[in-house]
Amino acid sequence: TPSAGGMFKREWWKRWTAMPSGLTDFIQSWDCTFKDKDTSDFVVGQVWARKGPNRYLLDQVRGRMSFTETLDAMRGLSAKWPQTTRKLVEDKANGTAVIEVLRKEISGIIPVEPFGGKIVRAHATTAVAEAGNVYIPAANIAPWVHDFVEEMAAFPSGAHDDQVDCYSQANAYYNDNTFDISALIS
């Protein structure tokens, strides 16, 4: 049952070994938590893009970070992926502080008001993964992908849900913004 974990099945995730051409709508999704660094949740930033109906997780940063480390991580990911036109940041608690500081120096920071609870938000994005439309890096490209898959598989009963939150935020954005610009540029 979803309450016992297993909302996202391990076999749902498709793998990419070379970044596909023709990707569009590059975004970042951020879950910002900074408290006591030894026991706090993780700060997670993900880079996503899409091609047709498919969504691609391209990169991720994850760690227990202070406020200044979180700002530096977002600056770094934005510099590494300048094609990310939107940076989605949950406008709650720590995310609000990040938004206030970085929107003065990084373009495209979009405050996101979360809907429902974590389980509701995650469940709203299961169909695209179950349908085989979510691609994640192969393990030899991104060593962190194992932890991503395991956290997703354990949700909502796992110890952490920060990567789930980022995934849900990015894919809820794509679900709500289905316009495919690639049809105009091909």
Predicted regions and their residues:
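Short, charged, surface-exposed loops that flank catalytic or proteolytic processing sites
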Residues: 137-138, 159-163
